[in-house]
Amino acid sequence: MDIVNDHLAVKARLLTPTDNGFLLLAAEIGGWAGPFPLPARPRSRVLAQIGPLCSRLARRDDVAEATAFSAVLRPPGEGSRLLHRAGVRPARYDIVVLIRTGGVADLEALRTDPARLELVALLENTGRHVHITAASNPARIADVDHNADSWFLFNYFYCRDRQTVFDVWQYTAGWFQRKTALPDSALMQPLTGEPDDYSLINHASWPSLRTFLPSLLFRPTFRSFVLANFSANEIAAQPIIYRRLR
């Protein structure tokens, strides 16, 4: 790991990782115009059907919550050339469903759940590209509060070396804690045998746009420290901001 502008490097303040398991279902259904998702009737139809499926999943004893998200914005990221060289499809997921289970072992029982199977079929029959992975939590600032009317981040990290992503993330997350008052963040690491297009996926939230977006657009150290360290360590960071499906 190489740290650029190391005088700015402060590690994030972390809690002990959670024992929860995570099932992430991400779908690219509509198109994008720059950083914004274009209106798409197929996306609207899918969103109308996802809510009842999430409710059915949430009623399981081994499921802590099942939450659906719709994309609203792609903030500045890093690594488009790296993705192109590696032949990796860029993350353009406009719908995400995140299922949190009581433990990692509980994820196996979800594979045959009828609501999960219906959800997968719905996304695969409608989406241009679907990414599904089961994951554990290697690190967290705090559990992400899905009950709040917040702006939710999923950042899809690609790198050949997962440990490098984790090491760099500790410092970039520290920057976000200090510069944007980041209240929560939970890393998801694909389990052995699961699709690992993304070495790690970071999930986080902020209470409002003004708490984080101005820093991404106007604070110089976002580019000279955060994006520069991703670039120096050959990490493709692909952040997308979502709103929770009500």
State each model region's role:
Residues A115:
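Conserved CoA-thioester-binding segment of acyl-CoA-metabolizing enzymes
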